[in-house]
Amino acid sequence: EMCIRDRCMSRAKSAFGDERVFVEKYIQGAQHVEFQVLGDGKNAIHFGERFCSIQRRHQKLVEEGPWLSDEKRQEIGALVCKGAESVGYKGLATFEFLRDANGDFYFLEVNPRVQVEHTVTELITGYNLVELGIRVAQGEDLPLSQSDITWRGHAIQCRLNAEDPKEFVPSPGRLWDCHFPSGFGIRCDTHAHPGYEMPGCFDSLLAKLLTWGHDREDAVRRMRTALDETQITGVQHLIPLHRRIMDEPDFLNRDITIQYIDNHQDLLG
């Protein structure tokens, strides 16, 4: 252990002229949980949590919510609102945490912006977060109180990246054809269309496919159908991976950590 520390200090000294290093606690069985917050510079409210532990290269692939008990949501929600109010935060923010196997939370960071997965929260609360963020940014006070926020059903989002589903290598090219599902409980946010040139030098996100259900099982069933109905021709994509995840026993049993993809290499095909 001392050897590793000394080596790290040596590298820090040579790279930055400062040998001080931070030692962080290893979180066993870590899960990624984040809270959506809106502040007006004086007060803050939260819109609950999103569960984002299915990741590749520390970037999210599947997000869903809600995930926590009502009691834990109330506890952590009060803390994040207090944090936002203490710095006079104005706008949308995401407070991100790691949760260990014992259920304890460890603060990671605040993302001071709207997140890709804000759509999950919109489906389960019924509020347009982008609109609320704009209204607050232009000087309005919070138009809602915490008691106005309730959660209904369950939502899941799959990121349909233009990537090789085995190695996650970007797959640029022309979309010769594409079709995205619609209907009750389905939302798809995308810029894709037949003839679109998917670039290789920017983020590989092609579409966000979401489903809402009365409970998690209902949302999963609807996501299976939505994935089956989605057609993308011309580039590789992650639909096969997402489809396998929706049937995987650990996923269905909520036995998910940030090592999920690493521990389920068979899902990559």
Mark where each language-model region is.
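ATP-dependent carboxylate activation and anion-phosphoryl transfer catalytic cores
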Residues: E1, R5-G269
